[in-house]
Design a protein with these regions (language model features):
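Membrane-interface alpha helices of multi-pass inner-membrane proteins
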Residues: 126-128, 162-177, 183-188, 217, ...
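Transmembrane-helix motifs of polytopic, lipid-linked glycan transferases
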Residues: 91-113, 148-149
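Extracytoplasmic catalytic/substrate-binding loops of multi-pass membrane glycan-assembly enzymes
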Residues: 34-49, 60-76, 83-87
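Membrane-interface helix-loop-helix junctions at transmembrane boundaries of multi-pass membrane enzymes
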Residues: 198-210, 287-313, 324-327
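Hydrophobic/aromatic-rich transmembrane helices and adjacent perimembrane loops
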Residues: 181, 324-357
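Hydrophobic, aromatic-rich transmembrane alpha-helices
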Residues: 102-103, 274-303, 341-346
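Short periplasmic/luminal acceptor-recognition loop of GT-C membrane glycosyltransferases, typified by
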Residues: 393-449, 458-463, 467-481, 506-514
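Loop-to-helix entry region of an early transmembrane alpha helix in multi-pass inner-membrane enzymes
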Residues: 68, 72, 82-102, 274-279
């Protein structure tokens, strides 16, 4: 009894220590770069949604958005803090980051006995480096939490744990349906793996039924929204249908394989970084294939295998899909955590002569690839950032971002004063929360081509809002002419040309500015 009590005390102390470490790391990162950088693009997309939820609007129904969970999380914390500004949003995201980092470090610490503090510090540094970009910290943390859910099931596959694991998968899907899909795939593989050479209950069928019931319970917030929130069910299914229409979840980019690095035209630093990025992309696939083969082989031989390795093995390929869906470093960072967690858990149990050189190598590679992308580095000492005020907070941002913010404020003062609406399309959803305005258009981030019916509805919304000015960022995204706004939304573009007057003197030829006629 004493031994069991002592063991529980140790686990509680260990968890508390890791929570303190996780909080310290995130707090230190926030101090370093919380006031640095600002994106009118993706970060603005999240910020607009959080602001609109604070005002009573519903994600997906009232504005284009991610899945609802992250907006309600952000809105609740921002409401508690009495602030709807960008720093309040970043604070809400940072709290979620603490949860993700804690889960990751706790799983690594539990993967072997007597884990050293030095190893956990290195693991924390590696995970924190890859926690980028900050507006995607929900997604990164969810990928870590999914690993934890599967480990929870693998350690003790009881009936209750099948149900609870399913419930967690459903709840994860409230924050992101893609994570729910990845969690479902990983869960099915784990449940099949658990049945190998296993005679006790629950078997695969009963376990699956319990798990599926849990998924329904976990996803209940969205299911209830489809039943109780007027108009939500239609837009929810439309958002799913649209994915099948465009046949993609992202705009693809070529995979930056190591052999595609233009060694003759880049610096040594950039060449090394390019090779490392390509190797990490290969690693996400290679780890998934070899780890699955390893854990299945060990299972057939009835040999023990670390639960973290099993969980990461079956999540690696689903998350590699996300990394490859738009093959840049930002999406690699969101899909790499099964690889990182699997490697860190595997190395933790190795002899010192293998563990330490390997973890230092992983740390160095992560530092080389990721450090230059963090806002704290980009606006650090000697970097050319300028100070601007955004929602009552002083931010250090790149000069072009400051120029864009100044332009939007100038246009609003001249053409849309006293809270009058405006349109900023297709890439600047952050313009609306920046100026505390509601977007006339539902589609605040207009990346994909839309059909005639959709465009006509948007035109009616623009007509009803009577915007004072419209700014069209005429950019061929990824160098693709078909992705210019006039090609993805030709009816809306023609409506603007027919009903608004061009404003001369644009600071950038790509910024097509129109004022109300």
């Amino acid at each position: 009894m004493f031994s069991k009590h002592q063991g529980n005390r140790f686990k509680t102390l260990q968890a508390s220590s890791i929570l303190v470490l996780s909080s310290f790391v995130v707090f230190a990162l926030f101090l370093w770069q919380g006031h640095k950088g600002f994106s009118l693009w993706d970060e603005g997309y999240l910020w607009y949604g959080a602001q609109r939820v604070l005002l009573g609007e519903v994600p997906l129904r009232d504005f284009m958005s991610y899945d609802p969970g992250r907006y309600y999380w952000s809105a609740v914390l921002m409401s508690l803090w009495g602030d709807n500004g960008i720093m309040a949003l970043r604070g809400a995201v940072a709290v979620f980051q603490v949860i993700g980092l804690f889960a990751g470090l706790f799983l690594i610490a539990r993967s072997t006995t007597n884990q050293s503090l030095a190893y956990l510090l290195l693991a924390a540094a590696i995970l924190a480096l890859w926690m980028f970009p900050r507006h995607k910290l929900f997604d990164i943390s969810l990928s870590i939490l999914l690993i934890g859910v599967l480990v929870f099931l693998i350690r003790q596959p009881t009936s209750m744990r099948y149900f609870l694991a399913g419930m967690c998968i459903g709840l994860v899907a409230v924050f992101g349906r893609n994570h729910g899909v990845y969690g479902v795939l990983g869960s099915l593989c784990v449940m099949a793996w658990l049945t190998i050479g296993r005679a006790d209950q629950p078997g695969f069928i009963r376990g699956f039924m319990l798990w599926a019931a849990g998924v329904i319970v976990g996803f209940a917030p969205v299911l209830l929204m489809t039943l109780l929130v007027p108009g939500f069910v239609m837009v929810f299914w439309e958002s799913i249908r649209f994915l099948f229409e465009v046949k993609a979840t992202n705009l693809p980019l070529p995979v930056p394989w190591p052999w595609t690095v233009p060694f003759g035209s880049v610096s040594v630093d950039e060449a090394i970084r390019g090779v490392l990025v390509g190797l990490f992309f290969i690693g996400t696939i290679a780890f998934g294939i070899f780890a699955i083969a390893w854990v299945v082989w060990k299972k057939f031989r009835r040999e023990p295998v670390a639960p973290v390795l099993v969980a990461t093995a079956f999540l690696a390929l689903p998350y590699a899909h996300y990394a490859y869906s738009r093959a840049d470093v930002g999406h690699l960072a969101q899909g790499i955590f099964p690889l990182l967690m699997g490697c860190l858990a595997l190395l933790a149990a190795q002899p010192a002569r293998i563990k330490w050189p390997s973890v230092f190598l992983l740390s160095g590679a992560s530092l080389w690839v990721m450090l230059v992308l963090h806002p704290g580095w980009q606006c650090g000492a000697g970097k050319h950032c300028v100070s601007i005020e955004v929602s009552g907070s002083e931010l250090n941002v790149a000069p072009d971002t400051a120029s864009n913010v100044h332009l939007l404020r100038k246009l609003a003062d001249e053409y849309a004063p006293h809270g009058r609406s405006f349109v900023a399309a297709p890439f600047w959803p952050g313009a609306y929360p920046l100026l505390a305005r509601k977007s006339p258009m539902w589609e605040i981030y207009a990346l994909f081509p839309r059909n005639e019916v959709f465009q006509q509805l948007e035109i009616e919304r623009i007509r009803a809002a009577n915007p004072g000015f419209i700014l069209i960022y005429d950019l061929s995204l990824d160098g693709r002419e078909e992705l210019r706004f006039r090609n993805t939304h030709p009816l809306i573009h023609q409506y603007i040309l027919d009903n608004f007057e061009p404003v001369p003197g644009s600071p950038d030829p790509a910024y097509q500015i129109y004022k109300s006629a």
